[in-house]
Amino acid sequence: MAEEKRDPALETEETAVQPEGASPKKKKEPETLESTLYCWTQALVTAVVSVVLLFTFGVRLISVNGPSMQNTLYTGDELLILNSMFCAFQAGDVVVLNAYNAEEPLSETLVKRIVAVGGQTVDVDPVSGTVTVDGQVLDEPYIKEPTYTTAGTQFPLTLAEDEVFVMGDNRNHSSDSRDIRLGAVNVGYLQGKVLLLLIPGATPETEARDWSRIGVLR
């Protein structure tokens, strides 16, 4: 009768001796319904607390009301705002500010675009409608029409280090830093920077929501 051959590797496995002092492997106990519910509850509570803290101290939602930021923003647009304490404001940012420093109330809050920041000199040509900052003509593809001025802020205007100059993208239908009631805005009055357009309002042309507008503002 032929002798059965054994695989040396298997023999090694079979005769392997557990090292001295090593603890035996424990079988993983199956998860109970209680432990599963506990894990899900813990994750849910953590998520809710994180969202509450985020919206309390970090971000918040606001609605646009008025035509001053067309064609970038429209009435009914819902925006996600990053709190000012986390912002380093720069020219081109779309920001939310309160107008409490205005000589006459303009609105509780305003949504505008920063055109110039502290230390810069801004000027508006009354003939061509071009805006210059520190002598450089701004490239402003976002504005609805050229910028024209009426009696108000005197140009050229050099900003203090803690000021910004803001204007609406719908330049000729916007109360902003060109208006002597508001003027240059102290950065302490900036509530935050617009991060995202979350929900679009209806555009005047189509009276419908254009969902392709959702995203980061430019």
What are these regions (language model features)?
Residues 2-218:
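Extended hydrophobic leader/signal-anchor segments used for secretion and membrane insertion
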